[in-house]
Regions:
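Fe(II)/2-oxoglutarate oxygenase catalytic core
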Residues: 1-169, 176-179
Length: 179
């Protein structure tokens, strides 16, 4: 599936996502993921890009998203999220493609440590092909929306047999409205 260029969305540009991924301090990031289950990637996106993505939640054409989940209905917490549709926004597709080759070795280490035989391919396209061959054809990237006091309980939205262990709660971009 190809990405949607969001040139009509101010602040989103087709950038060299691979260059941003290479600039990340991966040894420190890997260690943080091993020790804490999360890592901070400062300045992965600019403030303008974050603002443009955050605006998508309420202002995007409905075809941008495939479904909406109100977390309290499912015991997932307080707040809501929307799953993107294909084609994904350029920034989402670009980051997913660029970060995956760095995250796959971590996922493989975790599976080895847990005695799980599944290994993740080095290329994101190969993992997506594996998922699609198994009938898992819906995109899983999503955009969360929280108000003051909202929260997310630890949970997994499992969709089929093939699951990448570093899911969106491990790789999340937090947009903060200072107002």
């Amino acid at each position: 599936m190809s990405a949607v260029p969001l040139s009509h969305q101010p602040g989103l540009k087709n950038d060299d996502w691979a260059q941003r991924a290479v600039a990340i301090d991966w040894p420190t990031t890997t260690e943080a993921l091993h020790q804490q289950g999360n890592a901070v990637l400062p300045q992965l996106l600019s403030a303008t890009e974050c603002a443009a993505l955050a605006r998508l939640y309420g202002n995007a054409d409905e075809s941008t998203f495939r479904s909406r989940v109100v977390m309290q209905r499912h015991g997932f917490g307080q707040g809501e999220y929307r799953y993107f549709s294909y084609p994904l926004p350029d920034v989402v597709a670009g980051l997913r493609e660029a970060l995956y080759p760095h995250l796959a070795p971590i996922a493989n280490q975790w599976n080895t440590a847990m005695g799980i035989d599944v290994r993740y391919p080095t290329r994101h396209a190969d993992f997506i092909a594996r998922c699609h061959a198994a009938g898992q054809v819906r995109p899983t990237p999503l955009l969360l929306q929280y108000a003051a006091g909202d929260y997310n309980c630890l949970h997994q939205d499992l969709y089929g047999e093939h699951v990448f262990p570093l899911q969106r709660h491990t790789l999340g971009v937090i947009f903060h409205d200072a107002g």
